[in-house]
């Protein structure tokens, strides 16, 4: 039997933003099961967010949450607010802490993580064994968010 997704998390709303499920995947040996959403602000797409459940070696560098906000929609805290909305899904799946990561020099992203309450664990080189490693991959900021 595969990973048990919960349809209650297919659409999550809070304030003027809504997350609508784009894809669900059971994951693999390397990639964890995830929910992947479009972020909508008053019905207009402004970005995407994913929440990955479980843990493995790669999670530490990839993080449990990944987000991107369209360039023209930046500066409205959509990433932070979307992150807050997916936390219940993480809790539902038994998560008690999340890793959230970003490139060392990605100031908008690390400010988002810090505003969420993420605690910086380290800034590190990413090992070659990480599934998404590539030549020149930037150093990563690794944060932990306790749920």
Predicted regions: what is each one?
Residues 2-60:
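Acetyl-CoA-dependent GNAT
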Residues 91-101:
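Conserved GNAT acetyl-CoA-binding A-motif
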Residues 34-36, 137-142:
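Short hydrophobic/aromatic beta-strand or adjacent loop that forms the aromatic wall/cage
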Residues 105-122:
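Conserved active-site alpha-helix within GNAT-family acetyltransferase domains
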């Amino acid at each position: 039997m595969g990973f048990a997704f919960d349809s209650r998390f297919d659409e999550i709303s809070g304030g003027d933003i809504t997350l609508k499920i784009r894809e669900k995947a059971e994951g693999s040996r390397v990639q964890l099961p995830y929910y992947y959403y479009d972020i909508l602000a008053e019905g207009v797409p402004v970005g995407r967010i994913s929440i990955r459940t479980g843990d493995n070696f790669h999670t530490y560098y990839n993080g449990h949450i990944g987000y991107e906000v369209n360039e023209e929609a930046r500066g409205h805290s959509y990433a932070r607010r979307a992150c807050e909305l997916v936390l219940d899904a993480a809790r539902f799946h038994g998560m008690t802490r999340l890793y959230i990561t970003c490139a060392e020099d990605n100031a908008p992203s690390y400010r988002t993580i810090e505003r969420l309450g993420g605690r910086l664990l380290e800034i590190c080189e990413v090992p070659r064994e990480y599934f998404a490693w590539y030549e020149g991959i930037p150093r990563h900021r690794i944060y932990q968010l306790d749920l």
